[in-house]
UniProtKB/Swiss-Prot annotation:
Note: Expression of MES9 can restore systemic acquired resistance in SAR-deficient tobacco plants.
Matches recorded under PANTHER family: METHYLESTERASE 9, METHYLESTERASE FAMILY MEMBER
GO molecular function: hydrolase activity, acting on ester bonds; methyl indole-3-acetate esterase activity; methyl jasmonate esterase activity; methyl salicylate esterase activity
Catalytic site positions: S78 (acyl-ester intermediate), D206 (charge relay system), H234 (charge relay system)
Catalytically driven reaction(s): methyl (indol-3-yl)acetate + H2O = (indol-3-yl)acetate + methanol + H(+); methyl (-)-jasmonate + H2O = jasmonate + methanol + H(+); methyl salicylate + H2O = salicylate + methanol + H(+)
Protein's name in the database: Methylesterase 9
EC number: 3.1.1.-
Domain of life, source organism: Eukaryota
Function: Methylesterase shown to have carboxylesterase activity, methyl indole-3-acetic acid (MeIAA) esterase activity, methyl salicylate (MeSA) esterase activity and methyl jasmonate (MeJA) esterase activity in vitro. Required to convert methyl salicylate (MeSA) to salicylic acid (SA) as part of the signal transduction pathways that activate systemic acquired resistance in systemic tissue. MeSA is believed to be an inactive form that needs to be demethylated to exert a biological effect.
A Pfam cross-reference name: Abhydrolase_6
Pathway this chain belongs to: Plant hormone biosynthesis; Lipid metabolism; oxylipin biosynthesis
Induction (free text): By pathogen infection.
Length: 256
């Protein structure tokens, strides 16, 4: 039996794994899902998030609660890749493999914010649509928020069932934009995050994080293996849940 820990993306929550969780459990595995700070039904506000550690706190608490011999398959989607990478840096001995599903994936050279800030710089005004950036924090420590409006969200859910898109519209929450002011300027370590096995799952019809940007992140920080779900949009847990579970089961078998 493997133990999967599933990390949701920005503005979403543990709810987005509702199709994948029972499939993995039906295959005989243990699955842990949770809400990141100020997401899903977590009662914190985005203003409570002053550091990347604050954002990742529920994930860090989950990993901390496991025994020293417990190893998990850490699966991160979209913006969840950055708090997941921090968790892997802090608890490398508890990670058998980290799986980045069309996800922001830091390196060990730049600050963890580097890939997200690079992404923001790569999208045009036309592509940005109603992807809204806001601000909070103080003059000394300015921070940014991000929110996925219904038009940008629709692009992310392009091949997903309409019901899942409607559900997402109802459940969206403001997320912290992962800037260097949030993460600090230090990179994740080669001894921690850099020492774990990583696999990247490319989603071939993703209009949220384009395929060329997914491929750039893989070039920027090479992984053990790259898999692809050709007909998946940005939300493979909705558009291609069976294919996603198939990849996750194969990965868990390969990286004990």
């Amino acid at each position: 039996m493997k133990h999967y820990v599933l990390v949701h993306g920005g503005c979403h929550g543990a709810w987005c794994w509702y199709k994948v969780k029972p499939m993995l459990e039906h295959s005989g595995h243990r699955v842990t899902v949770f809400d990141l700070t100020a997401h899903g039904v977590n009662m914190s506000r985005v203003e409570d998030i002053q550091t990347l550690e604050d954002f990742a706190k529920p994930l860090l608490e989950v990993l901390e609660s496991f025994g020293s011999d417990d190893k998990v398959v850490l699966v991160a989607h979209s913006l969840g890749g950055i708090p997941a990478a921090l968790a892997a840096d802090m608890f490398p001995s508890k990670i058998s493999v980290a799986v980045f599903v069309t996800s922001f994936m830091p390196d060990t050279t730049n600050p963890p914010s580097y890939v997200f800030e690079k992404f923001l710089g790569s999208i045009t005004e036309e592509e940005r649509m109603d992807f809204e950036l806001g601000s909070y924090g103080t003059d000394d420590h300015p921070l940014k928020t991000a929110f996925l409006g219904p038009n940008y969200l629709k692009n992310m859910y392009l091949l997903s069932p309409i019901e899942d898109y409607e559900l997402a519209k109802m459940l969206m929450r403001v997320t912290p934009a992962i800037t260097s002011n949030l993460t600090g300027t230090k990179s994740l370590t080669a001894q921690g995050y850099g020492s774990i096995s990583r696999v990247y799952i490319v989603c071939g019809e993703d209009k949220g994080i384009r395929v060329d940007f997914q491929r750039w992140m893989i070039e920027n920080s090479p992984v053990k293996e790259v898999m692809e779900i050709k007909d998946a949009d940005h939300m493979p847990m909705f558009s291609k849940p069976h294919e996603l579970c198939d990849r996750l089961l194969k990965i868990a078998d390969k990286y004990p």
